[in-house]
Swiss-Prot record:
The family this protein is said to belong to: Belongs to the sea anemone type 3 (BDS) potassium channel toxin family.
Name this polypeptide is given: Toxin Bcg III 29.21
Intrachain S-S bonds: 6-31
Annotated InterPro entries: BDS_K_chnl_tox, Myo_ane_neurotoxin_sf
GO molecular function terms attached to this record: ion channel inhibitor activity; toxin activity
Entry's localization field: Secreted; Nematocyst
One Pfam family from the record: Defensin_4
GO cellular component term, pick one: nematocyst
Assigned keywords, A-Z: Disulfide bond, Ion channel impairing toxin, Nematocyst, Secreted, Toxin
Organism expressing this protein natively: Bunodosoma cangicum (Sea anemone)
């Protein structure tokens, strides 16, 4: 996965799995998994 940020939260982006934080500031769009 690729590190990304969803607002003030950190997360991970996996190609083809854009869920969890739509509209977040991440790689190619959104974070797939928000880590906290």
């Amino acid at each position: 996965g690729v590190s990304c940020k969803c607002g003030s939260k950190k997360g991970v982006y996996w190609f083809g799995q854009i869920t969890g934080c739509p509209g977040g500031h991440g790689y190619k769009g959104s974070c797939s998994y928000v880590l906290g």
